[in-house]
């Protein structure tokens, strides 16, 4: 007898309960976005946070989503999805956990912001687990389709649920989880949750369709157990993970009271716990020399510090210029905690620390209130571009008194395009600009830290050079025609166009 069942009749016996289909789709999509957000933080200690690292993570995540969705849909046409969904969840969750040790082992070999390092680490961080998990939603869709008449509603509903999962995961991770949990905990927790859901689904499917679904391969179960163990023994660059950095404090073996603040892979600050007048880094000595030459000896200053680090200069000024009032703008509350707990920082009415974005805080500074603004927010791998532009420098200028001075630490390496562009930008705002650097840097043969000095008033170049010499600092001062030749045809950075990540030539071992 011919069948009377129409070809598009519902196949409800294959379908998952709607709520289970929704949970699986929501979770698999959300886990991919957690991986994307946390993946950027995982690779940052090795290659920095730049436009390139953001682009690489986002690009590889999108590629993995596309590949996974295509492959998952194709596989669902050839194989009963009930055989594949649970193994994919278990494998994908285990590999989410595996990302942690894989990035850390690979990062030991790929430190530095070279494009190849960025691309390789980004690929390790997201591609395989994101592709596996992205194969799950199209399989769930195929399983839930009962008839052609339902195609639009089923596909639309599950697509919306998957998108919602990604949105919730993105906001929850970026605004909540990274503020209260280390990246390692977020990643391992997400992976384990996905594995557990996969195991539970495998049990459910074996009970509901024993002749269709197979047992999970033993190797897959071993992988799920082994990955958290591998994550536990992987090398870590972090003594403490802050909102923006891997931070650690290293004792100076040659100076009992010396401490180095290391953020990610770079030495950012040196603090002598017993002697705040001891300045280890040359660029800090150069900025101190600027204050020696531009303000009467011992006279208190009103100073604003854009970037906190170890708060070396605020403590130095408080010691050598009693009565100095300093406000430190630091974006990372974790760095402030390290300063207070391990580097002996004590805040007071004379030394205030404000946590938040410096560009925003500059807008709230009273006009003409500061004798000195120190810029020390730029690292050797990445630059907060919003502090480099002419609009940002106009805020600095507004903050300064008529005879105030802006001294900013910059880091770059040949061809020094970023330094040249920032000097051009400074010259577009301030009538007086100097560059302090070692002779090979001024000749374009070497790189590292340099200090740019800007003001509305004439700057005493000879006095600054003498002050640096008195400290034994072999730096020179470039001014006038020499500075013009150094800047060349570099363009001015603006809020509309500031390609600092492309201009900067990083070098991983530069002291930040």
What are these regions (language model features)?
Residues 133-136, 279-283:
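Phosphate/oxyanion-binding active-site loops and adjacent basic polyanion-contact surfaces
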């Amino acid at each position: 007898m011919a069948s009377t069942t129409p070809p598009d009749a519902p196949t409800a016996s294959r379908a998952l309960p709607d709520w289970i289909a929704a949970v699986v789709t929501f979770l698999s999509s959300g886990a991919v976005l957690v991986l994307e957000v946390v993946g950027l933080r995982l690779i940052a200690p090795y290659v920095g946070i730049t436009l390139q690292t953001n682009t690489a993570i986002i690009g590889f995540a999108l590629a993995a989503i596309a590949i996974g969705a295509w492959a998952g849909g194709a596989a669902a046409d050839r194989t009963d999805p009930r055989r594949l969904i649970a193994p994919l969840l278990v494998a994908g969750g285990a590999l989410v956990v595996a990302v942690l040790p894989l990035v850390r082992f690979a990062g030991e070999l790929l430190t530095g912001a070279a494009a190849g390092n960025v691309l390789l680490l980004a690929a390790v961080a997201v591609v395989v687990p994101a592709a596996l998990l992205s194969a799950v939603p199209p399989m769930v869709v195929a399983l839930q389709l009962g008839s052609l008449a339902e195609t639009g509603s089923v596909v639309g509903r599950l697509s919306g649920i998957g998108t919602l999962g990604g949105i919730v995961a993105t906001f929850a991770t970026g605004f909540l989880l990274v503020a209260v949990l280390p990246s390692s905990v977020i990643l391992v927790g997400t992976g384990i949750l996905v594995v557990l859901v996969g195991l539970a689904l495998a049990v459910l499917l074996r009970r509901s369709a024993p002749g269709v679904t197979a047992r999970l391969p033993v190797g897959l179960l071993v992988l799920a157990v082994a990955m958290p163990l591998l994550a536990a023994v992987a090398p870590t660059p972090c003594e403490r993970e802050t909102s923006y950095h891997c931070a650690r404090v290293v004792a100076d073996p040659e100076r009992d009271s010396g401490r180095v603040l290391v953020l990610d892979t770079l030495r950012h600050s040196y603090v002598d716990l017993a002697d705040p007048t001891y300045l280890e880094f040359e660029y800090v000595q150069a900025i101190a020399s600027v204050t020696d030459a531009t303000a009467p000896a011992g006279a208190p200053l009103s100073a604003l510090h854009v970037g906190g680090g170890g708060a070396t200069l605020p403590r130095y000024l408080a010691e050598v210029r009693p009565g100095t009032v300093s406000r430190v703008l630091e974006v990372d509350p974790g760095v402030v905690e390290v300063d207070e707990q391990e580097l002996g920082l004590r805040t007071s009415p004379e030394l205030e620390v404000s946590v938040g974005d410096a560009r925003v805080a500059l807008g709230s500074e009273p006009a003409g209130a500061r004798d000195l603004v120190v810029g020390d927010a730029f690292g050797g791998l990445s630059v907060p571009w919003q502090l480099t532009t002419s609009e940002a420098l106009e805020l600095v200028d507004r903050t300064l008194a008529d005879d105030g001075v802006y001294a900013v630490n910059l880091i770059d390496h040949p061809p020094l395009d970023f330094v040249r562009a920032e000097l051009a930008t400074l010259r577009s705002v301030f009538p007086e600009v100097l560059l302090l650097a070692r002779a090979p840097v001024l000749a374009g043969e070497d790189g590292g830290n340099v200090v740019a000095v800007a003001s509305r008033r004439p700057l005493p170049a000879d006095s600054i050079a003498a002050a640096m010499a008195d400290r034994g600092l072999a730096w020179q001062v470039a001014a006038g025609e020499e500075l013009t030749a150094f800047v060349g045809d570099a363009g001015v950075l603006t809020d509309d166009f500031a390609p600092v990540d492309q201009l900067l030539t990083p070098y991983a071992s530069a002291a930040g």
